[in-house]
Amino acid sequence: MRIPVEYIWIDGARPTKRLRSKIKIVDVEDRTNVSLGDMPDWGFDGSSTGQAEGNFSDCKLVPVRVYNHQYDHIPLVLCEVFHSDGIVHETNTRHALARMQEELIDEDVWVGLEQEYTFFQGQRPLGWPEGGYPPPQGPFYCGVGADEVFGRGLVLEHMYSCLNYGIQLSGINAEVMPGQWEFQVGSGDPLKMSDDLIVARFLLYMLGEKHGINVSLEPKPVRGDWNGAGCHVNFSTKSMRQDGGLELIHEACARLGDRHKDHIAVYGHGNEARLTGLHETCSINEFRWGISDRGASIRIPMDTAFNRKGYLEDRRPAANCDPYEVCHILMETICK
């Protein structure tokens, strides 16, 4: 049986990589349960994606995870990028995370990813008055009503699409700035959660196309007294989740502080406009951690402090971060 499948990959755009996709027609035995074994390697013009020069432009797509839809929609195939000779491409950050996760398998790392994003219609956030501004922030976070939240129909459509594709979505909410939303993925192993986040972003972009709404992952989409957009990461190891784990979380915070600049370097372009010390952030030039402190670099949730075990939340990553790079450096800093 011949069916269409959508190959998805991350390009080499700078300073922030983008998603690319194209459709391939493949032969499968069971269209309701397409597997990696059904998916051949493919190629693309790397000179058009910032991943090759025009005189040697072929790059290879290697399928690494298939997302089947429970109601027979087109399967989605997440791919890694390789050079035509089979060498891992420099833009392929997933490959390094897969190796790191295998190396640290006994740590049993879990992550949860909180993806914030902003809807735009034309040059202004969705729901904002033309040529003006909405009322000050306050009523919009988890708001209800057509005067407080904008784009809920698309958000719910995205939620169900993610669930139907088997993405480990754990929640959604309207955010502090009007026109801004968040969805959460996880918790689970870093590679699967990062894959799920990339495919969830892809679905959000595709639904935005359908509705004529642009989806922005800019860390500070509107200058001024408005919240930015982040991708907070909830992180734990098996030992942190066990009795006495709080001491290990404190040790992890100290390690993270020692490598603050290294982390900021891979936490998303334009993050300096967001990490100002205002709007529930810590200054990009400062590192501190605290219990239940959303103005800290690292927040230890109240339940974690009370139970003396659990997880930490790294609040520094920007909405446009590469989750593979973020999870890789967190594991490297905390677990090695």
Regions found by a protein language model. Name each.
Residues 1-336:
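Glycine-rich, acidic/polar active-site loops that bind/position phosphate-bearing ligands
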